[in-house]
């Protein structure tokens, strides 16, 4: 599984592309360019904060059959610019309305188009956070960023849960020898 990291401009968030899937959805033009005419099957969302979702509507306009995989709380946050914090940067304000695309995932193992996906609920940075284990990779969003401290000052943050889940993800990654793909990139 080859993974391409798309470095988004907004808050240096990261979007990952592999085998017709995305993890998070930032700069739509960069994403569409990286797909280079290939099919987009689905988008896994780690949480609903603006810097991880702001390209969603434009990408789904280009790929209307792609599914959006997320937690129930992320789904609720996609529809509310206060919950997804997009009201903070008005030019990226976002309220999602395309519910036919959304597949709510609970913690556990799922088979999606023949691909095994382990979903881990990791609230803390935000109450809706999920991490995804696919093959020997773990996509941690903002729940575990090896080179940065977790930000826990949002309205739905929980500092103690954030640190607990960060330690849990670090342990899972180390014990299972998983390569970590966090929700932000560094220069």
Predicted regions and their residues:
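Short Gly/Pro-enriched turn/cap motifs at secondary-structure boundaries
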Residues: 6-7, 100-102, 120-123
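Active-site HxH/HxHxD metal-binding segment of metal-dependent hydrolases
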Residues: 27, 32-109
């Amino acid at each position: 599984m080859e993974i391409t990291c798309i470095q988004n401009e907004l808050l240096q968030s990261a979007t990952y592309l592999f085998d017709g899937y995305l993890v998070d959805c930032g700069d739509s033009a960069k994403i569409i360019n990286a797909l280079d005419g290939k099919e987009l099957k689905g988008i896994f969302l780690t949480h609903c904060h603006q810097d991880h979702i702001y390209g969603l509507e434009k990408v789904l306009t280009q790929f209307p059959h792609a599914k959006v995989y997320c937690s129930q709380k992320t789904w609720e946050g996609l529809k509310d610019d206060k919950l997804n914090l997009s009201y903070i940067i008005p030019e990226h304000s976002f309220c999602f309305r395309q519910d036919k695309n959304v597949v709510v995932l609970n913690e556990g193992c799922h088979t999606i188009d023949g691909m095994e996906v382990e979903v881990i609920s990791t609230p803390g940075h935000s109450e809706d956070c999920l991490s995804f284990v696919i093959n020997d990779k773990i996509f941690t969003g903002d729940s575990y960023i090896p080179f940065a401290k977790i930000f826990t000052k949002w309205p739905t943050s929980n500092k103690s849960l954030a640190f607990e889940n960060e330690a849990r993800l670090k342990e899972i990654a180390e014990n299972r020898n998983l390569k970590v793909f966090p929700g932000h990139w560094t220069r």
